[in-house]
Design a protein with these regions (language model features):
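Interdomain helical connector at the RecA1-RecA2 junction of SF1/SF2 helicase-like NTPases
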Residues: 405-497, 512-521
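Conserved helicase ATPase motor motifs in RecA-like P-loop NTPase domains
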Residues: 266-267, 371-374, 387-406
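Conserved segment of the helicase C-terminal RecA-like domain
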Residues: 624-654
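ATP-dependent helicase/translocase motor core
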Residues: 2-290, 299, 303-314, 332-335, ...
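A short beta-strand element within the Helicase C-terminal
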Residues: 591, 596-620, 636-640
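Conserved RecA-like ASCE ATPase "motif II neighborhood" in helicase/translocase motors
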Residues: 336-369, 374-383, 591-593
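Catalytic cores and motor modules of nucleic-acid processing enzymes
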Residues: 15, 53-54, 259, 284, ...
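Conserved C-terminal RecA-like helicase domain
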Residues: 467-591
Length: 921
């Protein structure tokens, strides 16, 4: 049976949309798109318009709409605007309505748009004439990643004008279908999602997807409710299916019942966005007097503040003053309040707030509690419940409490169901890993003590002081050395960071001191909460003094000025370094309890464990490592220095509701060896020798080579995280040299494909996953560090150091560094040779690079006969916003040119700006 062609799939898709009451319209080119928009926009706004929109009025409308970024266009789309008519009257117009029955739905296909190149778009869905959803199709058997890459090409070359109003992209090959939000930035495949049913079962077939996702009432909800404008990052975010189902379930619960409920969404699944969106929607309901979003104080002080203000700018009040909360409660116009559990508990107990708080005693108030099992909440729950007699409480948790792991008070075990009632929706860790919304775990258990008995047997507690054994100098030194020796292999040469969880403050301080005695180049620090009235008997040092000492070392390491008096600022700085927000990161952070729950960091990939953990505490701690980042982070790595195997199995079984945890814990070393060897054999069937790639004339063969070598490298990436990995092993059937030779051919094809050409190539849309190929050790930061450490006081050694740096520059395959090689070599030859110390290296390099930037801009401007200052301004705007408008560039070119020549010049300017910015970023 022959494959269904892309054209046949397209026709079938359009016929399905016709059945769903989308009207097919012929739009052959961009001009036709504009004309259709005019007709549909007038029809949609007809009840508000007495007369047709005039040409001058259209000019005003297009001045509002065009030349804006994707993010700005999304804001315009959602706002009403005032059109001043030629007769002086004013009318409020809008682009679409939340009621799907009031909108006009159309579908068109094969629209040709001329940008840098001529592109033809597969299927466009229009709402009231605006292209809001773009669908790109591939024939069956083709990876839908290629459709994502095709969208990126179109964005770069021709998605301008009204196409900036595209909100969602859909990609499909008929059997696999995903959706993702538009962006001014490069699109990430990891942010393309499958749609599912309520039970998290994927709906991948294009026809079924159309019936469910593109139902007119549903797609309007996705556009109006479930696409979020992130004000901080200036990007669009579209919610995942399980988030949508949870919000819908809670809205039904709040509007149709008075019962409490909770949502079980695994750690890392985006509960904060789900809970905040629920609060936002319920706050618009006139039957609900207040919606109060409760968080723990420490959450509000850290990352949750940032998250909330992304979703709604200025939504969070970070003060600890209860009178501010009382003022917000009194304000009838303030429907949504974000506050802490502590402030709310104070407000209902203190007499001075009694009048304000009593006004809501018998009103419908909804409380939404993010991470509903924070320790403080249980203690304050009763006071709040007692006061608000008609309140509903909705909780969110990634690790619910059941009989087996709940908090026991007397003879009663407090469970999540007891506190919040029924679970309305669940999305478990196995679901999240399957959807690649979080990573699986690679867990290693390292034996650190010998003996003919079970160290985890509780009956031994009286006979043996296990705590003393765990704290022995020999054992702790063994563990510290093991961490130092293996850390770089585990973190891809320091590309990622780690947390080391230990059992007590005493253990933390002791480990910290042991690390200081070992020779290494890692940045290691610690953090803990100290007791104000601590019993210091039997201790050499009060824990606050220990922390002060650790902070002092931290200040020397990073040039900061913290102390225990500025603990919050120290906490924030450490948090930023573990998240990779600072130039100089932290390699290992030692903690007792802090950072083990609720802390999200994509660059955090390793957890070293020397403490007892079980159930929710265990999964929460492990889950710090499993945030999806990019291809170079295939899983979270857990290194256990205690026997937590059974406890790990128990926790994963409980929170996945299954005895089968195979998808959660990744297989062992031998599995990846076998997979690597399988891919080597497959690769050699395509290209027996590296040189065989040079003689490949057929692009389909080149594509097979690229895809196979890419997959081989992914298995190698996983292998390299295992302690036992070595290319010299007999178990591997490819040597390191042979791998590097094949890799050079892969990079050759990548380089050839990346060069912009009008020639259509099957490689254009292949995902090369180039970050997998980078030798991250030799990157810009590494080279600059080598330059800073040149021996300027020894001329002979200085010459050797400079030669070594040039050799390293010649060996790099890091794309960012490759763009800077010529600048760095020139800096070494012209500036560094004349320096006598490293004191001014950074300032000297910045001056040198800025001059190189200026010269490059002037040279290009001279070649193209354009104004250099104009070019500099456009580059500055692009560096700030990340967006470029070709129409704006065209308008700023003053010299008269024929249309085609001006278009060609604009394309060259756009290419120069992109390459220039990439080079100097």
């Amino acid at each position: 049976m022959a494959y269904q062609s892309e054209a046949a799939l397209e026709q079938q898709f359009i016929e399905q949309l016709n059945k769903q009451e989308y009207t097919t319209v012929a739009i052959p080119d961009y001009d036709a798109l504009v004309e259709n928009f005019k007709v549909q926009f007038e029809a949609f706004n007809a009840p508000k318009l007495d007369t047709p929109i005039t040409d001058k009025e259209w000019e005003r409308i297009f001045n509002l709409m065009l030349g804006k970024s994707v993010f700005q266009s999304a804001k315009i789309l959602r706002d009403k605007f005032v059109l001043e008519r030629e007769d002086g009257t004013k009318v409020y117009l809008s682009f679409f309505d939340q009621d799907h029955t009031k909108n006009i739905f159309q579908v068109t296909h094969q629209t040709t748009v001329v940008g840098k190149y001529v592109n033809r778009y597969d299927v466009t869905i229009l709402v009231n004439g605006l292209p809001l959803i773009q669908v790109e199709l591939k024939r069956r058997g083709i990876d839908i990643r290629e459709a994502v890459n095709q969208v990126m090409r179109y964005k770069k070359h021709s998605y301008n004008g009204l196409y900036h109003f595209i909100q969602l992209f859909i990609v499909s090959n008929g059997v696999d279908t995903k959706y993702f939000a538009n962006s001014d930035r490069d699109l990430m495949y990891s942010l393309a999602f499958f749609w599912t049913d309520f039970n998290n079962v994927r709906i991948t077939n294009l026809k079924d997807f159309s019936i469910s996702f593109l139902a007119r009432d549903h797609i309007i909800k996705m556009l109006t409710r479930y696409t979020i404008l992130n004000d901080t990052d200036k990007i669009l975010m579209v919610m995942r299916p399980y988030q949508v189902y949870a919000v819908e379930a809670l809205i039904r619960q709040a509007t149709l019942t008075n019962r409490n409920a909770y949502i079980w969404h695994t750690t890392g699944a985006g509960k904060t966005l789900t809970s905040f969106k629920t609060a936002q929607i319920l706050a618009a309901n006139p039957n609900i007097k207040k919606v109060i979003f409760l968080v723990d104080r420490k959450d509000l002080d850290s990352q949750t503040t940032e998250e909330f203000n992304k979703f709604e700018a200025g939504s969070v009040d970070v003060t600890d003053r209860t009178d501010v909360l009382a003022r917000q409660m009194k304000d009838k116009n303030r429907q949504l309040i974000v506050t802490t559990m502590q402030k709310m508990a104070n407000a209902v107990k203190r007499p001075q707030y009694e009048k304000v708080m009593d006004a809501y005693k018998d009103e419908k108030v909804v409380f939404i509690i993010d991470e509903c099992h924070r320790s403080q909440f249980g203690d304050m729950h009763k006071d709040i419940v007692r006061h608000f007699r008609k309140a509903q409480f909705f909780g969110f948790t990634g690790t619910p409490r059941f009989e087996v792991n709940g908090k026991t008070e007397g003879k009663i075990t407090q469970t999540t169901e007891m506190l919040f009632g029924e679970c309305l929706h669940n999305y478990l860790i196995k679901d999240a890993i399957f959807d690649n919304n979080v990573l699986g775990f690679h867990i290693e258990y390292i034996k650190t003590m010998e003996g003919d008995f079970d160290w985890d047997d509780p009956t031994l507690a009286d006979a043996i002081d296990i705590g003393e054994l765990y704290m022995s100098d020999e054992r702790m030194s063994l563990i510290a050395n093991h961490i130092i020796q293996n850390h770089k292999a585990k973190t891809r040469n320091g590309q990622y960071t780690a947390i080391f969880a230990v059992s007590s403050i005493d253990a933390l301080v002791k480990y910290y001191d042991i690390f200081k005695k070992i020779k290494h180049d890692l940045n290691i620090s610690g953090i803990f909460s100290y007791g104000q009235n601590e019993d210091a008997e039997g201790k050499d040092e009060h824990s606050r003094d220990s922390l002060e000492r650790i902070i002092k070392d931290y200040n020397e390491m990073y040039g900061t000025n913290f102390s225990t008096d500025t603990f919050s600022a120290y906490h924030k700085d450490i948090s930023d370094r573990v998240k990779g927000k600072k130039t100089k990161s932290l390699d290992i952070l030692i903690v007792v309890n802090m950072f083990l729950t609720g802390f999200d960091s994509k660059p955090l990939s390793v957890l070293y464990v020397d403490k007892d953990l079980k159930y929710h505490d265990l999964l929460q701690a492990y889950s710090r490592t499993n945030r999806v980042e990019k291809e170079t982070k295939p899983f979270g790595i857990i290194i256990c220095y205690r026997n937590l195997k059974k406890r790990t199995d128990d926790a994963l079984t409980l929170f996945s509701k299954s005895q089968d945890t195979s998808g959660i814990v990744v297989p062992g070393y031998q599995y990846f060896v076998e997979k690597f060897n399988e891919m080597v054999m497959k690769l050699k069937e395509i290209a027996l020798f590296p040189e065989s790639v040079d003689t490949m004339q057929n692009e389909d063969d080149q594509k097979k080579f690229v895809v196979t070598f890419r997959e081989l490298t992914k298995y190698l990436q996983s292998l390299q995280t295992f302690i036992e990995f070595s290319f010299d092993q007999d178990a591997l059937i490819m040597s390191e040299q042979e791998y590097q030779d094949y890799k050079s051919k892969y990079l050759m094809l990548y380089s050839r494909q990346k060069t912009d050409r009008e020639v259509v190539s099957v490689l254009n849309d292949v995902d090369f996953c180039i970050e997998l190929m980078e030798s991250d050790r030799i990157n810009v930061a590494y080279i600059m560090n080598l330059i800073r450490n040149i021996h300027f006081d020894d001329p002979k050694q200085k010459d050797y150091d400079i030669k070594h740096i040039k050799d390293e520059l010649g060996r790099t395959d890091n794309p960012q560094l490759l763009r800077k090689v010529e600048i760095l070599q020139a800096f070494l030859d012209r500036v560094v040779v004349g320096l006598e110390s490293a004191d001014e290296i950074d300032a000297a390099y910045n001056d040198f690079e800025n001059e190189a930037k200026r010269e490059e801009i002037v040279a290009f401007a001279k070649t193209e006969d354009i104004d250099a200052s104009m070019l500099t301004d456009i580059i500055s705007e692009y560096e700030f916003s990340g967006t470029m408008d070709a129409g704006n560039i065209r308008d700023r070119i003053e010299k008269p040119l024929p249309l085609l020549k001006k278009r060609s010049l604009v394309n060259r300017i756009v290419d120069f700006i992109r390459q220039h910015t990439e080079k100097y970023q």
